[in-house]
């Protein structure tokens, strides 16, 4: 369970975050767009950050944001369901983190690949994935400064982190 540092003070020793980072890195390396560059930053006493830099063929610079840390499992799970083992039931996926914005990396890369497959001209895009959002993102300001040369001057931020009113439809939030 890749719990955020506020909920797992021994996150580094427990190794769950490193495992998730490794799995995410493997997935990105397999599916990332052509000519993209993957950056992984790890600084002592800070959670890691992942940036996928995708060159564009038109003006503009988009930052797509998401996270891969989780809140605690809480209580109230049905007997056949549990927080740490995903289960498909009635065409729905159950498990801790399934609807907790863990999709951001995959949705970002998937949407970029789909647009590229359709021949859509895209600006430069940087996908930024952090690992301490559920703890209030204490490491994000440091990395935003540290990685400024990768992130660049941003024209649009797409934040893949929100809520849902029910499980019957897709929800979008604009702020």
Name what the model sees in each region.
Residues 1-75:
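N-terminal helical capping/dimerization or prosegment-like subdomains
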Residues 3, 97-99, 138:
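Gly/Ser/Thr-rich beta-alpha loop segments that engage phosphate groups in nucleotides
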Residues 7-11, 27, 65, 77-80, ...:
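Tryptophan-centered motif/residue detector
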Residues 41, 97, 132:
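Glycine- and other small-residue-rich loops at beta-strand/loop junctions that grip anionic moieties
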Residues 42-45, 87-92, 175:
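Short, ordered beta-strand-loop transition motifs
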Residues 46-49, 81-83, 169:
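Short glycine-rich loop/turn motifs
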């Amino acid at each position: 369970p890749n719990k955020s540092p506020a909920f797992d003070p021994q996150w580094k020793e427990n190794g769950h975050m490193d495992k998730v980072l490794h799995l995410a890195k493997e997935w990105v390396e397999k599916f990332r767009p052509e000519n993209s560059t993957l950056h992984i930053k790890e600084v002592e006493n800070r959670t890691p950050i992942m940036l996928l830099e995708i060159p564009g063929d038109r003006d503009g610079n988009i930052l797509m944001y998401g996270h891969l840390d989780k809140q605690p499992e809480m209580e109230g799970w049905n007997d056949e369901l549990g927080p740490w083992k995903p289960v498909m039931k009635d065409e729905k996926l159950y498990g801790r983190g399934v609807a907790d914005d863990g999709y951001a990396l995959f949705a970002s890369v998937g949407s970029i690949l789909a647009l590229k497959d359709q021949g859509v001209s895209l600006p430069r895009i940087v996908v930024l994935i952090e690992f301490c959002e559920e703890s209030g993102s204490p490491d994000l300001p440091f990395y935003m400064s540290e990685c400024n040369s990768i992130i660049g001057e941003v024209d649009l931020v797409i934040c893949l982190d929100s809520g849902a009113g029910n499980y019957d439809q897709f929800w979008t939030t604009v702020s």
